[in-house]
């Protein structure tokens, strides 16, 4: 629940938020054409959006298990008023699933991405720390330096009874810029948590949680941080009423 019901978003769980789209579905298959993610134009450049972001997903389901396979692709060019006009390609492929074993359940997931930041991936800023750098860069010749990365997560839970559920999880995210020197050393973040959902009444529950997160930055990109490998420990709880 930390970080606004973070759910390991940006730390093993790939997430891009909600954007305008046109979606088609048949059975367990979904195909979507989505508004691309870019930053604003400025005095030196404009973005030439040629095609929409394209995403596809297929969901497999059984009585006690599920499996989701997904992928996405985004492409645009940067038109500099002076100099080159580089193309930016970003994509992701991933797999996630889960299974119930009586009162226990386990969820696993993983993904690999190129230029995830340009794609619009959510960057985790736990405790106000700076998200790891998962975006491309432009060099002095106005060429694109790509960024590649991956993430994974695992969650294990136990439904003790109708009132109590115990859950623990761990997530990891890594990204590396394709440049020489310290800036290409790669950055990572991992998080582990343990919580308990307590059902007080129908629609009313409380979730106490403890957790730990650790960041590892390439030193040259640590803007506003006191150290290259900060970490945080947190403890708290939330309550929620569903009407």
Residue ranges and their predicted role:
Residues 1-40, 48-55, 59-63, 98-102, ...:
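Outer membrane beta-barrel
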Residues 7-9, 29-37, 67-75, 165-175, ...:
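Transmembrane beta-strand segments that form the barrel wall of outer-membrane beta-barrel proteins
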Residues 16-20, 25-27, 48-54, 87-93, ...:
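Residues that define the transmembrane beta-barrel architecture of outer-membrane proteins
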Residues 22-26, 56-60, 95-99, 108, ...:
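Residues on the lipid-exposed face of transmembrane beta-strands in outer-membrane beta-barrel proteins
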Residues 38-51, 55-57, 170-195, 218, ...:
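C-terminal/domain-terminus segments
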Residues 61-190:
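Detector for outer-membrane/organellar transmembrane beta-barrel domains
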Residues 192-211, 215-217:
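C-terminal closing repeat unit and adjoining cap/tail of repeat-based domains
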Residues 198-200, 204, 229-243:
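Outer-membrane beta-barrel "beta-signal"
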């Amino acid at each position: 629940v930390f970080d606004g019901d973070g759910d390991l978003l940006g730390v093993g769980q790939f997430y891009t938020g909600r954007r305008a789209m046109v979606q088609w579905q048949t059975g367990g298959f979904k195909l979507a054409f989505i508004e691309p993610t870019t930053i604003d134009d400025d005095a030196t450049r404009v973005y030439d959006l040629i095609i929409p972001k394209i995403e596809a997903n297929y969901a497999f389901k059984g009585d006690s298990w599920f499996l989701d396979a997904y992928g996405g692709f985004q492409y645009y060019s940067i038109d500099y008023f002076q100099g080159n006009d580089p193309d930016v390609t970003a994509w992701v492929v991933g797999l996630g699933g889960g299974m119930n074993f009586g009162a226990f359940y386990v969820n696993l997931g993983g993904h690999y991405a190129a230029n995830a930041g340009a794609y619009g991936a959510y960057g985790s800023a736990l405790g106000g720390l700076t998200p790891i750098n998962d975006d491309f860069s432009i060099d002095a010749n106005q060429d694109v330096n790509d960024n590649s990365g991956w993430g994974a997560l695992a969650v294990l839970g136990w439904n003790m009874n109708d009132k109590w559920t115990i859950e623990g999880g761990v997530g990891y995210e890594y990204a590396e810029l394709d440049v020489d020197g310290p800036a290409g050393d790669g950055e990572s973040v991992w998080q582990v948590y343990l919580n308990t959902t307590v059902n007080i009444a129908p629609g009313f529950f409380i979730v106490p949680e403890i957790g730990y997160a650790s960041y590892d930055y390439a030193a040259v990109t640590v803007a506003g941080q006191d150290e290259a490998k900060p970490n945080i420990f947190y403890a708290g709880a939330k309550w929620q009423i569903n009407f």
